[in-house]
């Protein structure tokens, strides 16, 4: 089990997805953030749910995902809906840029 798999709210499926995109430690996940982790997962062909965003954010705050404040959920949802640069995320997200 990786360090990410021992974080609160993150089970084996979340751990496998995050590990597959190069996220193995709490500092790596903290640097990437919940929204960019979700984006990186989708760019790499995974189909995470919005609940994973809540779970990651809550894990980083060390609280149960159901205790995530509504204003935090609203902020995260707004960030997800905002324009973003996929190329920059691929370059910064795991150090490997995909062709195409």
Predicted segment positions?
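Sterile Alpha Motif
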Residues: 1-8
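Structure-specific DNA junction-binding interface
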Residues: 5, 16-20, 31, 35-100
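An amphipathic, hydrophobic-aromatic interaction surface with interspersed Lys/Arg
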Residues: 26
